[in-house]
Amino acid sequence: MNRVYFKASRVLAGVLMCLALVACDKAQSPPAAQAGLAFHPGDECHVCGMVISDFPGPKGAAVGAGGTKKFCSPAEMLGWWLQPENHRADVKLYVHDMGRSHWDAPDDAHLIDARTAYFVIGSRLKGAMGVVLASFSDLEAAQKLAREAGGKVLRLEDIDQKLLGQAGAMSSMSH
């Protein structure tokens, strides 16, 4: 009889340990919407100081130990994050999924992890000053925009300061 209780208690302890580990994993990184991340009319871009809601297109946010920093575009956010002093793994990067939002009014319910996003650079779409990076969770949606409005599909690891600088120079000539 004691053996049965001993085995049952070991099994129960194992199950409880698994549940605790699963709960810890889920609490570690909530989606942007669950974290309460939203853009408000008075929010200013962390880089340029402009009012974020004054511009169409996707926005960006970096969430880390130092709080939340909001940006008027994914390009502004990535330009900031690519600086050596800001390029940290513990910073969560969010952008609007433009496959699920209207260009003129991105929906904060559709913020996605920038590390998994597809970006279209070089399109004819207008956004905040400088480089326009349209962000998508779905490759097909990104490819569709690139076909219809021009541009090239990239992943986060394809984007660096040099690319942002070159695209910014080209963008200022065409505006």
Regions found by a protein language model. Name each.
Residues 91-156:
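Thiol/selenol-based redox catalytic cores and closely related redox-interacting motifs
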Residues 37-70, 75:
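Post-signal-peptide N-terminal segment of Sec-exported extracytoplasmic proteins
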Residues 81, 103-105, 163-167:
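Short, charged, surface-exposed secondary-structure boundary motifs
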Residues 75-86:
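Short metal-binding segments enriched for Cys and/or His
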Residues 29-37:
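Short, intrinsically disordered, charge-biased short linear motifs at domain edges
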Residues 1-22:
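Sec-dependent bacterial lipoprotein signal peptides
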Residues 150-175:
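N-terminal targeting pre-sequences for secretion and organelle import
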Residues 24-27:
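Bacterial signal peptide processing site
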